[in-house]
Amino acid sequence: MEQLCKRILEEGKALNEYVLKVDSFLNHNVDPKLMYEIGTYFKEYFSARGITKIFTIESSGIAPAVMTALQMDIPMVILKKQKPNTLTEDVYQTTVHSFTKGSDYELTLLKKYISDKDKILIIDDFLANGEASLGAVRLVETAGAEVSGIGIVIEKSFQKGRKCLEEKGYDIYSLARIKKLGKDLIEFL
């Protein structure tokens, strides 16, 4: 997506060879017009699959996921990184390792928000090692539902996430694929 790549080059900052800071438009200060365009691209790519729900992981995937859900006119479910005290009902949970934070968390989904008839599109802000996406996949499949695709805003293609997901048969559609990061260096595929 040309507009996204342009924003990454203009406003993004590679802090090192693994970390890309895009807080000016994606995951702190959010540009709703850009998120709307992102939703348009995901809708166009995934619209023929009979998707019934969008799943995303709190919190940086919420903006692109809600815009995709709005355009596809389907519900969106936010997977929680920890079980809040208010969640007293039955849940699905799986442990996920966060690349960004360097720690584990319990990804949580209320059972009432998924059925075995659902076709799920997973949307996330970044794909690095694939741990978050694989965690979401585990929750969906534990519930007996189908993962119909995975939409990624920014993929770090030099890390193993895409390979891990494709080896398991999942279709990944990334709007910006980064080949290389380095101090003040951002290179796209």
UniProtKB/Swiss-Prot annotation:
GO cellular component: cytoplasm
Subcellular location: Cytoplasm
Top EC category: transferase
E.C. numbers: 2.4.2.22
Alphabetical keyword list: Cytoplasm, Glycosyltransferase, Purine salvage, Transferase
Domain of life: Bacteria
Binding site for 5-phospho-alpha-D-ribose 1-diphosphate: A128, N129, G130, E131, A132
UniProt keyword Cytoplasm, yes or no: yes
UniProt: xanthine binding residues: L20, N27, K156
A GO biological-process term: XMP salvage
Catalytic activity annotation: XMP + diphosphate = xanthine + 5-phospho-alpha-D-ribose 1-diphosphate
Keyword check for Cytoplasm: yes
Molecular function per GO: xanthine phosphoribosyltransferase activity
InterPro entries linked: PRibTrfase_dom (IPR000836), PRTase-like (IPR029057), Pur/Pyrimidine_PRTase (IPR050118), Xanthine_PRibTrfase (IPR010079)
Involved pathway(s): Purine metabolism; XMP biosynthesis via salvage pathway; XMP from xanthine: step 1/1
UniProt cross-references to SUPFAM superfamilies, sorted A to Z: PRTase-like
Family the entry assigns: Belongs to the purine/pyrimidine phosphoribosyltransferase family. Xpt subfamily.
Subunit and partners: Homodimer.
Function, in words: Converts the preformed base xanthine, a product of nucleic acid breakdown, to xanthosine 5'-monophosphate (XMP), so it can be reused for RNA or DNA synthesis.
HAMAP family noted in UniProt: XPRTase
Protein name per its UniProtKB record: Xanthine phosphoribosyltransferase
